């Protein structure tokens, strides 16, 4: 069960993502989020709180990053990833390092998802559509 997002909505998102071609999936789920999210969370938020302390800046930007991902599982994973990315920026003094790491994390998930769905894509898409027809969306 999800705190912020209905599971049927999550299933619909997965089904939509599966419809993307591999290059479009990499661009829309790995390249663009890596650049945009890092500019916002490590570039703007973390830099803004750095005057308080680097640790506080990393923690606040990580919490915002976690909340932006919308459900409890994603929050936990994203917040911890945000801490890693924040320390990466802090120790390298470069947002490029966190953009690259973010791209590798998201890109590897796109590749893994596409590989996992290759053999079973039709069966998986049908199982995802079943809860959608029974949901209250």
Name these PLM-found stretches.
Residues 35-40, 44-45, 71, 104-108:
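Active-site His/Glu-centered metal-binding helix of metallohydrolases
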Residues 31, 62-67, 83-87, 107:
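Alpha-helical transmembrane segments of multipass membrane proteins
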Residues 1-36:
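Juxtamembrane helix-loop-helix connectors linking adjacent transmembrane helices
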Residues 36-60, 87-94:
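Membrane-interface helix/loop boundary segments of multi-pass membrane proteins
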Residues 31, 42-51, 111-119:
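Membrane-interfacial alpha-helical segments at the cytosolic side of multi-pass membrane proteins
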Residues 23, 27, 55-60, 75-76, ...:
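Hydrophobic alpha-helical transmembrane segments
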Residues 104-137:
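C-terminal membrane module of polytopic membrane proteins
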Residues 53-70, 103:
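Small-polar-interrupted transmembrane alpha-helices in polytopic inner-membrane proteins
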